[in-house]
């Protein structure tokens, strides 16, 4: 059944101009997996008749059961294009054979880390948008991620069959709906566009927008119709294509094109007249069983149908006719091949985003030229659990060189620093494998520009890594991925039977490997904590942990717990001072809140410890109103050296200051990771070292004296600066009909949420509601919401920002102070906070 073998696939891997690496991205339930099926069917991996129902790329049992994609799945497809299809193709190519490495990614926001992993190893993206629902929150998130990785998008307006069957809209109305959808997508693309990518917006008349119905397996771009009419009427194809979109009207009575509607009954817009109406007529003829009418249309359009197909009725008949006339695969493939870049093109502009080292060394050059003879550069973006329990494939993409079976590679983990031994391994690749949906084919080697799965490296890679040849000791790693969501929801897990503990520890290690986002840690109280992006994400992680990684051993999970952050509201009331244990050193300090937007800038990586100090002080001075000299005196960021807090040196002429800098920084990393209120991370606090008095003898000012003192003085300054708690807040988008709005508002009010935008979707009875909802209140939110709106409302939650809690945690009996004692109790600390007098000393 499969129309190609692994050897054919391997042969074409060398023609880097004939490869397309692309991912399918969209909002949840807009039909990614279903559309992918048509493409898979065209390559002959599944039968055409069942395409759309199999959802080939949903390989896990729970994916099929829930009807959502959870993990991104790769599949390599091989196509032979006809000469006429490639006539207008301008780029370089070798022959007519194309290899498309396609990755189907999840749409659900809890799994957006899977999307990031998929985008990193592809160059183009097919953005799927439901023609009725339009561009939603998640569409925007994934588009922003894609453009951030410099990935060129093409759009398909999916679920066209809804227009014909379910809603029965007329042509003009359909046209305005589609135009709105495309316009909304373009607005997002223009907002996040990158000057190096050029214009990334999509235009139907240029062939970068397709119209599809994934479930029925048909699709078209305007060029399909332009070709058809060009040969029929003998007009120029490109001219015809421009006429099929925009303000172009045709009146069959006068046989003239105009740019305005002349008002005659027969005068219709080009798109409606030549694309929408013919499809509508054929579908109507099929659904109403008007066989003779249908046959007339079919012969006119030159569709060849088998005799037994003519005996079908209703939907199956329509599906066959439409698939034969406008097969989804050819329209979408043509669009991908013409408008998405090959690795050779894409790596030229993506190298700056990918490679951490200097842009003129051997490695950067090899990536830029996509050179198979250069040194190996391979990025592993995720680990895929293999079918035999406990083993993992490392799934990634070769950016330069070749990776082959049995070769020795140098593995650089995410914490690797060039020139050091930390997080570095040299190991053998046992097998190189290419992925074909549910099965894998072993190949000898894989050259650059392709995706690959490697066997035998799973012990050394946690989530992602950079691989190069064993001798290349001066290679820098490829930049780590930025995730658009952060793990804010945590649960504690323990075994039901105490003897299963080793299984749990091992299982947690494997879980951390298999999911790009999840964080597993052990608290000081000995609890095992799993942190994820949301309720659904955690649910899937726990299911994987129990069934796959622990062999079904039972686990007990606590209620979900939310991470908080600690911050300050004002500058410290006074300069606080702490003395070292031997009373010979004194540190003076103040705390103040950071400027608006600065903490977010540090989170996004626009400002950080690795920046050039000149650039950094320029940004701080221009955007946040810092003093230029002050901006050069930032000692460090924290927690984890990159977090959104910092220490600034304000001292004037202090001796020996540099000697204690390291000790103060160490104390700061400790303090910022566990704040004074409830040992949660600090956020958005800027500490200013005002003065330091040190002992002249070096022996009296060692780390043992300074580190604890520094930590105490950080706590004291935090407590004198009106400390507050920050709680994480979700942005919730809800789609619902008008009669469900009352229920939505009441549920949101119970849960301390507030609505900030309500819009009616033009042309539909649905409303789009956006609201903020504290993560603490979000557990069970979707089930409560469905219950009170009788299942008509669908929420999507994305982590959005940190919101300050209004009450004062230092005031007994306030909401914040009860919350603090709850958190402290859970962590096994004293319920009462340590008072300020413990941290601050008097002269």
From Swiss-Prot:
This protein's source sits in the domain of life called: Eukaryota
Q: Does the keyword Hydrolase apply?
A: yes
Q: Which reaction does it catalyse?
A: GTP + H2O = GDP + phosphate + H(+)
Q: How is it modified after translation?
A: Phosphorylation by EF-2 kinase completely inactivates EF-2.
Question: Record's PROSITE patterns?
Answer: G_TR_1, G_TR_2
InterPro entries from the UniProt entry: EFG_II, EFG_III/V, EFG_V-like, EFTu-like_2, G_TR_CS, P-loop_NTPase, Ribosomal_Su5_D2-typ_SF, Ribsml_uS5_D2-typ_fold_subgr
Query: Which CDD domains is this protein grouped with?
Result: aeEF2_snRNP_like_IV, eEF2_snRNP_like_C, EF2, EF2_II, EF2_snRNP_III
Q: Name one GO molecular function term.
A: translation elongation factor activity
**Record keywords:** Cytoplasm, Elongation factor, GTP-binding, Hydrolase, Nucleotide-binding, Phosphoprotein, Protein biosynthesis
Q: Where in the cell is it found?
A: Cytoplasm
Indicate which residues the UniProt annotation says bind GTP.
26-33, 158-161
Gene Ontology CC terms, in alphabetical order: cytosol; ribonucleoprotein complex
* EC number, UniProt record: 3.6.5.-
Q: Which residues form the tr-type G domain?
A: 17-253
Q: Which residues carry this modification: Phosphothreonine?
A: 57, 59
**Broad class of the protein's primary localization:** cytoplasm
Family statement: Belongs to the TRAFAC class translation factor GTPase superfamily. Classic translation factor GTPase family. EF-G/EF-2 subfamily.
User: What job does the chain carry out?
Assistant: Catalyzes the GTP-dependent ribosomal translocation step during translation elongation. During this step, the ribosome changes from the pre-translocational (PRE) to the post-translocational (POST) state as the newly formed A-site-bound peptidyl-tRNA and P-site-bound deacylated tRNA move to the P and E sites, respectively. Catalyzes the coordinated movement of the two tRNA molecules, the mRNA and conformational changes in the ribosome.
Annotated protein name in UniProt: Elongation factor 2
Give the species this sequence originates from. Answer: Beta vulgaris
